[in-house]
């Protein structure tokens, strides 16, 4: 049996995507819509307080295309907190006009290739990646993915050293986009339908296409990668929520 890779796990992660029932939303009076937006922003302010205390992080984006209208990405220390956030959101008036479109549950993950005598949880660089402050980049791209397990193309039957070598080559491509694309990898084996979630942040949306296209030629993606649905969107600052929902 091939050796399993040891992983480092950080904050739990929820991607919550909703579509807006615009027809129903329009039936409310201007005052009713205003109250619903204010209630929602009060919830968001609680998230901001958590982020300021460095006990979690979140991001809010509008989604381009018809797959969804809004994407929320929430990071918290426990799965229970993610559930509480989702429940609190669902109890708001605005949620009555939000239709669930997609969700993904995972945990921020890094592969541990450090020497056995080094405690990764004492390494500031690793801690910053396991418990990240999500950037306020202009754009987001999220997609789930698996490693293929078919015939000779079975990632999990490869020796550990061969997997390490290929992942190192794969990661070199990503490092070429340092400063252009910020990446958060989250593991989801046993949590959701795919094995990983990949979230990319960039101020230039075209960098998503360039990075993902270049990686497709690397063996890790070309031979072993299987991908789910892609979601891309634009940042939705708190101060623009009211305008976005205005009728």
From Swiss-Prot:
Protein name from the UniProt record: Coproheme decarboxylase
Function: Involved in coproporphyrin-dependent heme b biosynthesis. Catalyzes the decarboxylation of Fe-coproporphyrin III (coproheme) to heme b (protoheme IX), the last step of the pathway. The reaction occurs in a stepwise manner with a three-propionate intermediate.
Source organism of the structure: Bacillus mycoides (strain KBAB4) (Bacillus weihenstephanensis)
Catalytic activity reported: Fe-coproporphyrin III + 2 H2O2 + 2 H(+) = heme b + 2 CO2 + 4 H2O; Fe-coproporphyrin III + H2O2 + H(+) = harderoheme III + CO2 + 2 H2O; harderoheme III + H2O2 + H(+) = heme b + CO2 + 2 H2O
InterPro entries from the UniProt entry: CHDC, ChdC/CLD, Dimeric_a/b-barrel
NCBIfam families tied to this protein: PRK12276.1
Catalytic residues in the record: 143
Cofactor binding note from Swiss-Prot or TrEMBL: Fe-coproporphyrin III acts both as a substrate and a redox cofactor.
Keywords in alphabetical order: Heme, Heme biosynthesis, Iron, Metal-binding, Oxidoreductase
Family: Belongs to the ChdC family. Type 1 subfamily.
Gene3D superfamilies: Apc35880, domain 1
Name of encoding gene: chdC
């Amino acid at each position: 049996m091939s050796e399993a890779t040891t992983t480092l796990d950080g904050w739990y992660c929820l991607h919550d995507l909703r579509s807006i029932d615009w027809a129903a939303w329009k039936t409310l009076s201007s005052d009713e819509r205003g109250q619903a937006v204010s209630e929602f922003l009060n919830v968001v302010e609680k998230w901001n307080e958590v982020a300021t205390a460095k006990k979690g992080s979140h991001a809010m984006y509008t989604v381009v295309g018809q797959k969804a209208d809004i994407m929320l990405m929430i990071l918290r220390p426990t799965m229970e907190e993610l559930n509480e956030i989702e429940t609190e959101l669902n109890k708001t008036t605005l949620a009555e006009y939000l239709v669930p479109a997609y969700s993904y549950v995972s945990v921020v993950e890094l592969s541990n290739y450090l020497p056995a005598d080094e405690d990764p949880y004492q390494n500031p660089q690793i801690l910053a990646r396991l418990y990240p402050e999500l950037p306020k980049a202009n754009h987001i791209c999220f997609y789930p993915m698996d490693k293929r397990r078919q015939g000779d193309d079975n990632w999990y039957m490869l020796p550990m050293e061969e997997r390490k070598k290929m992942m190192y080559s794969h990661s070199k491509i990503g490092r070429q986009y340092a400063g252009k694309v910020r990446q958060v990898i989250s593991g989801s084996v046993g949590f959701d339908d795919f094995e990983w979630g990949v979230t990319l942040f960039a101020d230039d949306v075209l960098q998503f296409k360039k990075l993902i296209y270049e990686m497709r030629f690397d063996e890790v993606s070309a031979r072993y990668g299987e991908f789910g649905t892609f979601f891309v969107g634009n940042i939705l600052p708190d101060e623009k929520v009211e305008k976005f929902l205005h009728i």
